[in-house]
Curated annotation (Swiss-Prot):
GO terms for cellular component: chloroplast thylakoid membrane; NADH dehydrogenase complex. GO terms for molecular function: NADH dehydrogenase (ubiquinone) activity; quinone binding. This is NAD(P)H-quinone oxidoreductase subunit 3, chloroplastic. Keywords: Chloroplast, Membrane, NAD, NADP, Plastid, Plastoquinone, Quinone, Thylakoid, Translocase, Transmembrane, Transmembrane helix, Transport. Belongs to the complex I subunit 3 family. It is found in: Plastid, Chloroplast thylakoid membrane. Gene3D superfamilies: NADH:ubiquinone/plastoquinone oxidoreductase, chain 3. NDH is composed of at least 16 different subunits, 5 of which are encoded in the nucleus. The gene is ndhC.
Length: 120
């Protein structure tokens, strides 16, 4: 039989953690001063007046480097627990981790050969 009262603490935590942000937004909406003006609709760039158009397109090259960074960053996050328990796991898990590392490396070499990482 599934006992619902075992999860009372979870449901209380869920309700409290949902109510607190909602109350914070409601209270700040009621107490905040309403001010309209040119400063309210202007772009904010570290306290400096924006120069030119606020909408500047970034080149796709930035996204390529960001994507490569994210792939290797996520790979590092997944490899860290494996490295901490390396002595317990054994050779089969080492081979799996090696394959896991080789797949992004092969993908990076392929992208490099195709010119996806060229800056020009």
């Amino acid at each position: 039989m599934f006992l619902l009262h075992e999860y009372d603490i979870f449901w209380a935590f869920l309700m409290i953690s949902s109510v607190i942000p909602i109350l914070a937004f409601l209270i700040s909406g009621v107490l905040a001063p309403i001010s309209q003006g040119p400063e309210k609709v202007s772009s904010y760039e570290s306290g400096i007046e924006p120069m030119g158009d606020a909408w500047i397109q970034f080149r796709i090259r930035y996204y390529m480097f960001a994507l490569v960074f994210v792939v290797f960053d996520v790979e590092t996050v997944f490899l860290y627990p494996w490295a901490m328990s390396f002595d317990v796991l054994g050779v089969s898990v080492f081979i799996e981790a090696l394959i896991f590392v080789l797949i992004p490396i092969v993908g990076s070499v392929y992208a490099w050969r195709k010119g996806a990482l060229e800056w020009s």
